[in-house]
A protein has these predicted regions:
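Conserved acetyl-CoA-binding loop-helix of GNAT-fold acetyltransferases
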Residues: 121, 127-140, 163-167
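Conserved GNAT acetyl-CoA-binding A-motif
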Residues: 135, 142-154
Length: 192
């Protein structure tokens, strides 16, 4: 599934499309009564910082154009990249997460880990397994780098993420305080 998705580092030219996807996710969460991401987070500065630090990753759907140009309108040039639409975004962090040092509970491992923050999928791609595939590709990258586990946190009312974490084999480890509130923390250890 999803062989046509290229998992790559985000570039500054992707930032506006990423923010469009973030705004779509914020609207969906609001419509579902999910309180996460309703306070202006993540902002453009967060995404720009992710990209500058090398944390930002996207899924680019091969061979599709983002928007067809109207008749007589010049096509956008994308610095030599093959045409493709960015359909998902996440911040993939290998530097640790300071908030994870004070967990009300216990992590399953004590070694290096990868963290995924700000995972969002474009409206037209939801329900097709894109988020789960993004998580699997992030896990594969982490395994290549030799880290011992994959950690993630989410809001208590983010039902979609909670179900996906369970399906992907993550274990609930406790609660952490991150940003504006308490989050549920999960970990998936990698076998040696």
């Amino acid at each position: 599934m999803n062989e046509d998705l290229k998992y790559r580092k985000a570039e500054p030219a992707d930032a506006e499309r990423i923010m469009e996807i973030i705004r779509q996710a914020q609207a969906q969460m609001r419509a579902l009564g999910n309180l996460q991401w309703q306070d202006g987070y993540p902002a453009r500065a967060d995404i720009d910082n992710d990209i500058a630090r090398g944390y930002g990753y996207v899924f680019e759907k091969s061979g599709t154009a983002e928007e067809p140009a109207a008749a007589g309108t010049p096509q956008k040039c994308d610095k030599g990249r093959a045409s493709g639409a960015v359909i998902a975004y996440g911040a993939v962090v290998f530097d640790g997460e300071p908030a994870y040092g004070a967990i009300d509970g216990a992590w399953l491992t004590g070694g290096d880990y990868v963290v995924l923050h700000r995972l969002a999928v474009a409206d037209g791609e939801k329900g097709r397994g894109v988020a789960a595939e993004f998580m699997r590709r992030t896990e594969a990258l982490a395994r290549e780098r030799g880290v011992s586990s994959f950690r993630v946190d989410t809001n208590f009312d983010n039902r979609y993420m909670l179900r996906m974490l369970e399906r992907l084999g993550f274990a609930y480890c406790g609660k952490i305080v991150y940003g504006s509130g308490e989050r549920l923390a999960f970990e998936k250890p990698f076998e040696a």
